[in-house]
Amino acid sequence: MAAAIASGLIRQKRQAREQHWDRPSASRRRSSPSKNRGLCNGNLVDIFSKVRIFGLKKRRLRRQDPQLKGIVTRLYCRQGYYLQMHPDGALDGTKDDSTNSTLFNLIPVGLRVVAIQGVKTGLYIAMNGEGYLYPSELFTPECKFKESVFENYYVIYSSMLYRQQESGRAWFLGLNKEGQAMKGNRVKKTKPAAHFLPKPLEVAMYREPSLHDVGETVPKPGVTPSKSTSASAIMNGGKPVNKSKTT
């Protein structure tokens, strides 16, 4: 009997010991579900904010990338000259097709609308309200030309801003028989003076030029920017024109 009792006690002690080890420790505390949820939400917010910042940076970089596909080209006039822009911005024609002054960036700025920029000078070809061509440091509405293919597959460039008031006839970019730049209102689209043949050299990507007001000048150090007319920049075959002179 005693042996049975002893073995029973031993069995009870062993069971008690096993139950003690199986019981979870008081020091082990379950973490609160709300606390876990808070940590999870915090991590998600951190991840989303990082993704958003990365997306904004990527979008800014994408905006800075060149978006417009244009061409570097020479413009051959049917009069027998290549259009050229001199270092001072004067425009005329030359028969020499090897000079860099005949290279132009043809940048699309609208549907069948282009900006014509000298590669060496960085100046835009512009046409003012009197039909004169002049070089512009800034891209303005006067620098926009409509590009149209004529019947003979030559291309004509007309001002997007100016035309004859009565007839509505467009004003065109043109060279005369001597290779001098003509007034836009004197150029007829049916004449060789207005007919150009682009001779592309390469395709290039361009950033969209910022549009400025007509007459706005490039600010210089210590000089207040003005919005006066661009009379000083007006050219006629490379010579300054007096605006007060009637045509």
UniProtKB/Swiss-Prot annotation:
Keywords attached to this Swiss-Prot or TrEMBL record, sorted alphabetically, are:
Disease variant, Growth factor, Neurodegeneration, Nucleus, Spinocerebellar ataxia
Query: One MF term in GO for this entry?
Result: sodium channel regulator activity
Location(s), subcellular: Nucleus
Segments carrying the region annotation (Disordered) are: 1-38, 214-247
One GO-annotated biological process of the protein = nervous system development
Q: Does the keyword Thylakoid apply?
A: no
Q: SMART domains under this entry?
A: FGF (SM00442)
Q: Does the keyword Nucleotide-binding apply?
A: no
Q: Name one Pfam family in it.
A: FGF
Q: Where is the composition biased (Basic and acidic residues)?
A: 15-25
Which organs or tissues contain this protein? Nervous system.
Entry's Gene Ontology cellular component terms:
cytoplasm; nucleus
User: Quaternary structure per UniProt?
Assistant: Interacts with SCN8A.
Family, as annotated: Belongs to the heparin-binding growth factors family.
Q: What is known about what this protein does?
A: Probably involved in nervous system development and function.
Which disease does the record tie it to?
Spinocerebellar ataxia 27A: A form of spinocerebellar ataxia, a clinically and genetically heterogeneous group of cerebellar disorders. Patients show progressive incoordination of gait and often poor coordination of hands, speech and eye movements, due to degeneration of the cerebellum with variable involvement of the brainstem and spinal cord. SCA27A is an autosomal dominant, slowly progressive form characterized by gait disturbances, ataxia with tremor, dysarthria, orofacial dyskinesia, gaze-evoked nystagmus, and learning disabilities.
What is the name listed in the Swiss-Prot or TrEMBL entry for this protein?
Fibroblast growth factor 14
The scientific name of the source species is Homo sapiens
Q: Which gene encodes it?
A: FGF14
